[in-house]
């Protein structure tokens, strides 16, 4: 069995799924499958999971609903699913090709080390056994497809992303009426309270003029050079998001880029927004703590007996992050300037 085609397939799958599903959920699923596969085919799951984590964050940057920062930026500035798909999605698509090539050669030696190991096909599980309830499987698949269609067409239908999210959640609850109590208990209320508090703090900073001071400082540093401003926003966002949660950072920076667009001649708010989006989404991929998906993925393989330290993680993640940001710079330069 050749492991490298599996690596490429899982990287693409991770990126595509993360365009529509939360990256944490995607990595929980793919990392578990990868660990299972590694035991069957006798290879280390570490390289494959690290590649999946990166591609999940990259895929999430392609759409408005892929990563929380994109939802915050898109909702605050009134952008649609199509706006993100045709802008950050273009960058993510080009970058994905480069990243697949990068990880293919970065991990080829490690994943090919055990290619002579004998594998017994009779030990492979039957995929159909994973579906415990076909009725629930069909219902959940239909709901998922409806959600994607509504998100893609929300600019045409006039429905907001928030309304679609709540409506789909209610439909899901109604189809699982017997388990509604259990589901409601599992809702992450701490995160909801966190977001409420976060936007109160950001609103306070905006009203007191702190964010305008930050915008003014960036404008002075750039000296009126709009492209330099875009690069500063993208790289600062990426570096900050590698060490701090990108959600509050994105929420804080939205008023800043609005102020910059209003006071700087030639500055396009949408370009600043997409630079912020790419920076916050991709920057978090550089370190094990930069994004929730990173923490979840490394935790899954650590529990399987394959601990991943900072050195192992950053050895490929930092160069991969730099590659994506450089591609983003080139695309932004040729498309908008």
Regions found by a protein language model. Name each.
Residues 17-53, 68, 72-87, 188, ...:
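Membrane-interfacial helix-loop connectors
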Residues 40-46, 50, 62-63, 82-132, ...:
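Juxtamembrane and boundary regions of transmembrane helices in multi-pass small-molecule transporters
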Residues 96-179:
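Long, contiguous bundles of hydrophobic transmembrane helices that form the permeation core
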């Amino acid at each position: 069995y050749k492991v490298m085609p599996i690596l490429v397939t899982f990287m693409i799958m991770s990126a595509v799924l993360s365009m529509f599903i939360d990256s944490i959920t995607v990595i929980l699923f793919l990392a578990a499958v990868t660990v299972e596969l590694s035991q069957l085919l006798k290879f280390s799951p570490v390289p494959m999971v690290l590649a999946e984590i990166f591609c999940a964050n990259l895929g999430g940057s392609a759409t408005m609903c892929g990563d929380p920062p994109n939802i915050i930026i898109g909702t605050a500035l009134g952008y649609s699913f199509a706006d993100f798909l045709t802008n950050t999605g273009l960058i993510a698509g080009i970058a994905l090709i480069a990243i697949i090539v990068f990880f293919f050669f970065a991990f080829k030696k490690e994943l090919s080390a055990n290619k002579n190991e004998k594998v017994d096909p009779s030990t492979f599980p039957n995929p159909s056994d994973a579906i415990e309830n076909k009725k629930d499987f069909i219902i959940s698949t239909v709901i998922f497809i409806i959600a994607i269609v509504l998100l893609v067409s929300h600019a045409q239908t006039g429905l907001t992303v928030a309304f679609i999210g709540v409506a789909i959640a209610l439909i899901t609850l109604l189809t699982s009426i017997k388990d509604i109590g259990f589901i409601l208990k599992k809702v992450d209320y701490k995160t909801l309270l966190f977001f409420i508090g976060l936007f109160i703090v950001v609103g306070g900073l905006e009203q007191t003029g702190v964010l305008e001071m930050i915008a003014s400082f960036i404008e002075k540093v750039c000296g009126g050079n709009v492209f330099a401003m875009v690069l500063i926003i993208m790289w600062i966002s990426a570096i900050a998001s590698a060490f701090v949660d990108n959600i509050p950072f994105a929420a804080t920076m939205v008023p800043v880029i609005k102020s910059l667009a209003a006071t700087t001649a030639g500055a396009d708010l949408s370009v600043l927004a997409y630079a912020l989006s790419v920076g916050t989404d991709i920057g978090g991929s550089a370190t094990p703590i930069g994004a929730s998906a990173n923490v979840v993925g490394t935790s899954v393989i650590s529990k399987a007996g394959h601990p991943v330290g900072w050195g192992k993680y950053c050895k490929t993640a930092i160069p991969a992050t730099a590659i994506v940001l450089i591609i983003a710079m080139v695309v932004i330069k040729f498309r908008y300037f």
